[in-house]
């Protein structure tokens, strides 16, 4: 085979491959849109979430602000330790 013929075959294969990928991606977009419309049409309506009384939870938090100090200190210590070990590994 001559180099010109081989080059033209490569261009042909490139065009064919890119064409199939483009067609597949277009098909994928339309299939995704169709599935989305089916789900919206046949899915049950969302039930609104129950709301809690925010004033009651705020009052509980204000009643004892030092209650979780030990847990907070443990979490912060673990986070600092993890960060320092990650810095040593890098």
From Swiss-Prot:
InterPro entries: Na_pump_deCOase, OadG. It is an enzyme of class 7 (translocase). Pfam families: OAD_gamma (PF04277). One of its GO terms (cellular component) is plasma membrane. One of its GO terms (molecular function) is sodium ion transmembrane transporter activity. The chain crosses the membrane at residues 10-32. Its cofactor is Na(+). Coiled coil: none annotated. It catalyses: oxaloacetate + 2 Na(+)(in) + H(+) = pyruvate + 2 Na(+)(out) + CO2. Keywords: Cell membrane, Ion transport, Membrane, Sodium, Sodium transport, Translocase, Transmembrane, Transmembrane helix, Transport. Its EC number is 7.2.4.2. It is a single-pass membrane protein. GO terms for biological process: sodium ion export across plasma membrane. It is found in: Cell membrane. Heterotrimer of an alpha, a beta and a gamma subunit. Belongs to the OadG family. Catalyzes the decarboxylation of oxaloacetate coupled to Na(+) translocation. This is Probable oxaloacetate decarboxylase gamma chain 2. The gene is oadG2.
């Amino acid at each position: 085979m001559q180099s010109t013929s081989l080059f033209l075959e490569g261009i042909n294969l490139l065009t064919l491959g890119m064409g199939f990928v483009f067609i597949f991606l277009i098909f994928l977009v339309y299939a995704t849109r169709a599935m989305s419309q089916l789900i919206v049409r046949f899915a049950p309506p969302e039930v609104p979430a129950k709301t809690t009384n925010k004033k009651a939870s705020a009052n509980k938090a204000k009643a004892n602000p030092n209650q979780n100090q030990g847990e907070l200190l443990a979490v912060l210590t673990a986070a600092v330790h993890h960060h320092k070990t990650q810095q040593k590994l890098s």
